[in-house]
Amino acid sequence: MDNVRKKNLLSPAKVIAAGFLAVIAAGTILLSLPVSHSGKCEVGFLDALFSTVSAVCVTGLITVDTGAAYSMFGQVVIALLLQIGGLGITSLGAGFVALLGGKLSTRGNSIVREALNYPTYSGIRQMIRSVMVLDFSIEAIGAFLSFFVFVKDYPVKTAVWYSVFHSIAAFNNGGFDVLGRGDSVGMYTHNVWFNIVTCVLIVLGGLGFLVMRELLGMLSAKLHGREVGKLSLHAKVVLMMTGILVFGGALLIKLTEGSNISVMGAIFASVTSRTAGFATYPLGGFSNAGILVICVLMVIGASPGSTGGGIKTTTAFVFVKRLVSVITGREARVFRRKIKDEAMSQAFIIVSLAVMWIL
């Protein structure tokens, strides 16, 4: 009987997929309700479905302007969908259980481990709790800092909501905005504070919770006079790739666009292109070369266990290492450690599938 029951249980990956499908169905129903619509423009079932899928998958693509088409209720629904999409339905559910002092089953631990790309089964409950606290703390700080931008252009109550929504959308790499202008966040193209806050939120969300937790642990040890441990190999690769993609991407965008974009605009475009989807400069104004750079950044995306998508920075790194290894005939190594053949094969398969799907 137990064997039959085990066979009938869905794998962690299937449970995660089923959870997302359930959230998409619920979100579509809620956004289809009249209470979710502002009445300023028509919102059909397909618009509601598209908005839901885009929010849960944190892509930032829209068929109707979020700020103009949806009421406050609809915008709250989208914000929740962005939060679920960034954290993951299983991680979010398990996080509330952990925060309330509950215990996760062995199966629950397995599902969360799969969702967050956690390497072991030990300390999962504590890890989930820290992820939840870290997530909401960063979003709260982001909302507070964003408020000083929006309050200059909108009434206080409106500025508060715009700040909260923007912080959630930025940290979860969602790309949605509720300004209702139709040009994303173009009105803040030259606002240095807005650009900095938004970029920091996007980058933090794209690093991955395990890397952020590791960095905070090192900072805490330093402040309390304890011995500071070394960064894990995963964290080193993620931080290195993030720096290369952000500044390398910005340099290429600036070189391809020249005087048509400022240095700040190039950095913002490089950061947001990887997974977020905000725009201070209209994409239609970019050259073909600039769009190609943006496309490469979009394919690579964020890091494992983060709020963003893409093939992941670590996969791109291992893939490039594999290519260099084949060309030079040398063993693929990273920070003096040999890269496993299995990891290189997985990276090659992921990149190949991504390219075939796009083409």
Give names to the regions the model predicted.
Residues 1-359:
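Membrane-proximal intracellular helices of multi-pass ion channels
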